[in-house]
Regions:
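Internal, well-folded beta-alpha domain core
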Residues: 85-230, 234, 238-239
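Near-N-terminal "mature-domain entry" segment
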Residues: 2-110, 114-121
């Protein structure tokens, strides 16, 4: 079983891991191209302000320095902050390393303990690597790191989950709804929080198959059998 998560633009650099560090060949190709960009080209690619341009330019130029971060500690978006509210991944390191994969436009499919550096890049950006878009470049590279027919619990955004042919796996999409006066609604913020908490709950409860996932009951969410299908689990919270 694998749990896939999207990365986050927001990052925390308060838990550095000083160590020798080598980029994979796939990631090095991307960094080399980014280093070749002028500031004007980089700003156009990243679509950032002058302040953020300087910050990201500096990150790229210093990419070979030895200070890195564990992926789960570095990413600090809403899903990851919610994850950390439920459980500490280092206390469940074996499960986290075996089952959780964060999908990155720079690093590919990485485990929570993999050492990475801060960056700003997503699959929708117009960067070309060997004539390929970022999405096409990573599609085969990411997918081949998963076994065919294994269970994949999708807690990632459509940007990353669309890399996969879902029919080749025991795939489970997960959606979260709030129900008020009989009406179901989805909210991006609530869904992001719930994805992070579900990943942490699965880790802390040593979930090994998708049927166990139906027991998830954090923050008032409960499995709704009437809305769910074999490959699509829906969780509803009454408000």
């Amino acid at each position: 079983m694998k749990i896939i998560m999207s990365p986050a633009k927001e990052m925390a650099i308060d838990l550095p891991v000083p160590k020798d560090w080598v980029l994979t060949q796939d990631s090095q190709k991307i960094v080399s191209i980014l280093k070749s960009y002028s500031k004007e080209e980089l700003q156009k690619l990243l679509k950032v302000s002058d302040t953020l341009l300087e910050e990201n330019w500096d990150k790229i130029q210093k990419f070979q320095e030895s200070v890195t971060y564990h992926a789960m500690d570095l990413y600090h978006g809403l899903a990851f902050r919610s994850f950390k509210q439920v459980a500490n991944w280092e206390e469940h390191r074996d499960y986290a390393v075996k089952h959780i994969r964060i999908l990155s436009a720079l690093y590919g499919a990485i485990s929570p303990e993999e050492c990475v550096k801060p960056y700003r890049l997503d699959l929708t950006m117009s960067l070309k690597i060997e004539g390929e878009t970022l999405k096409r470049y990573w599609k085969e590279r990411i997918v081949t790191s998963f076994e065919k027919e294994e269970c994949i619990v999708n807690l990632a955004s459509s940007e990353f989950s669309s890399l996969f042919n879902k029919k080749q796996y025991d795939w489970v999409d997960v959606d979260f709804f709030e129900k008020k006066e009989g009406v179901l609604k989805q909210h991006s913020t609530i869904s992001k929080k719930a994805r992070g908490k579900m990943a942490a709950w699965m880790m802390s409860h040593d979930v090994q198959n998708k049927s166990e996932l139906q027991k998830f009951n954090v923050d008032g969410f409960a499995f709704d059998a009437s809305l769910s299908r074999e490959n699509h689990y829906c969780f509803v919270k009454g408000i």
